[in-house]
Amino acid sequence: MTMRKRIAFLAGAISFDNQNRVLGGVLKRASELDMDVYVFTCFVNYDESEENKVGAFRIMDLQEFDLFDGVICMKNSIQYEPAVNSLIARIKKSKVPAVSVDEKVDGMYNVGISDYSSQKDIVEHLIETHDLKKINYVCGILQGKEGRERYNAYRDAMEEHGIPVCDNQIYHGNYNRESGRKAVEQFMKYNMPQAIVCANDAMAIGAMERLQQNGYRIPEDVIVTGFDNDELSEFFVPSLTTVDRRQELLGKNAVNLLFERSDDVNVQIDTKTIYRESCGCNMQPAMEIKDLRMEYQNKCLIYEEALDSLKCMELDLTGLENIDELCEKMKKYVVGSDMQSFYMCLCDKNEMFAYKSVCDHFTEKVSIALVYQNGKFCSDVDFLSKVI
């Protein structure tokens, strides 16, 4: 019997829509090829403390890449340099075929888009079609390729049209919705711009929320644009002008690159700029459609609140030194959720407590310290970490 091929997929936080859509493309193509995908991810924001990042990104140390037939890595999504450097070094050492999504990495295949030209198209649209001059920008993490290229595109488009940019027109965000809200609060301290261009959709939606809360109309008073074409961008009221990165196609092409062995090690996917209501284009006045979109928007916000609650749980559990206390606290969260089953894995208890300070690696043996199935908690189980 022929063994199914195995792909390791590595991403910083698939709770973000853009990462989740790439994964969706990987899963769909792998299913068509009768392959298995093993997902290694965590739930971490870009502004986490050093301690939380160290713990969260340890999952990236679990893989033995020699056991896989290929690796797909979303390098830019892992916003913690020590983890990224270690991960890339281990992938290269394994000699297993690997694809980097978005950012190019020496020795690996690459599939990505032109962040620069896509962002520049939006800024030029605002200048040339809407005749705007005061355009502020909410940038992402400038250490990453996406954030850097999108920011440079904004600055270049403004400069090429002879429009000066002041420091107070720039807000340095970290891709989450709260960054968009805080950006608007900063901009409100000065004269409000005609438009706010955001480096991703989450920040754009946060900006629109805060603008609406303060009585600003979009696009009549302030135009807002995003980037990524997240699911909510189409249904938010008003719908968001954005760039469709075609993430699912990125994922499918990543799988193809692994196993088709093309001579072209770099594949660039064409993006599509989608002009919607938030910039004054393609207005949709039908009230019944607006009501449906508002209903969907509210459901998405409830989902976001659930993710925030999960984050609070993680912070509540961080730093506990007693495993029994950890299990008891965890039980309250599990029972209060809709989960049908839950497994909490911990390093070997005896070895873990032999360390005077923080244990910086996974122990060889791992214990499932908490098991929840069919409404009941069960006894724990030990196994080797490498078989995860």
Question: What name fits each language-model region?
Answer:
Residues 345-388:
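GAF sensory domains
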